[in-house]
Regions:
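Catalytic-pocket segment enriched in acidic/His residues
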Residues: 73-196
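Active-site microenvironments in enzyme catalytic cores
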Residues: 1-123
């Protein structure tokens, strides 16, 4: 399984573009918490978790905390056509957040954290990977500022910062898998996987 050449080149370009890639991920009712099941689409064949740092932003656009996010993605749908990205990213149980919000951490501290993911299937580890939050190119406040341009969030927003760890192209999640994402300064977010 692979993404189209156009999709791959479009993603490469965004890292050096003046404007960051920001798009709408989820309504609150599409997200789940710790130990609740995340979903894989029944009409997709290549589904992966995307472990991400999540910024908790108040209604004024200021970052007030951090948590762990899992941006579930149907890579075959996304790779077929970039215009299908909303279908690949936003569906029931396509996002998990938790286990809690860490308040008061400055950017230098947050950038020192590591992020990792493990996936188990029938109690056997089938994937693990990790990276450092310091690999995020843009400043966290720049991302928040772009999100709040020309729009308001009366109750604030959660902004997931993108992933640096994804399983190999020959891997897909299966119903019954368990995904655990760890961020060193926050803790662990664990979710079983179901088909939706």
């Amino acid at each position: 399984m692979e993404e189209s050449d156009f999709s791959a080149s479009a993603y490469d370009q965004v890292y050096d573009a003046p404007r960051p890639e920001i798009f709408f991920k989820s309504l609150p009712e599409k997200a789940v918490g710790p130990h609740e099941a995340v979903g894989i689409r029944k009409d997709a064949h290549w589904n992966v978790p995307e472990p991400e740092l999540a910024l908790i932003i108040n209604a004024q656009g200021s970052i007030v905390g951090h948590t762990i996010g899992n941006d579930m993605s149907s890579r075959d749908i996304e790779g077929e056509n970039l215009l299908y990205l909303p279908q690949a990213k936003m569906y029931d149980r396509s996002c998990s957040l938790g286990p809690w919000i860490v308040l008061g951490s400055d950017d230098a501290t947050v950038r020192s954290w590591s992020i990792g993911v493990t996936i188990t299937r029938s109690e056997e580890m089938v994937f693990s990977g990790d990276t450092s939050i310091s690999q995020i190119k843009r400043s966290f406040q720049e991302l928040a500022d772009y999100l709040f341009r020309s729009q308001r969030f009366a109750h604030g927003a959660v902004l997931m910062t993108g992933t640096g760890v994804v399983p190999n192209d020959d891997f897909t999640l299966e119903q019954g898998d368990v995904v655990t994402i760890d961020i060193s300064g926050i803790g662990s977010l664990t979710n079983p996987v179901i088909r939706v």
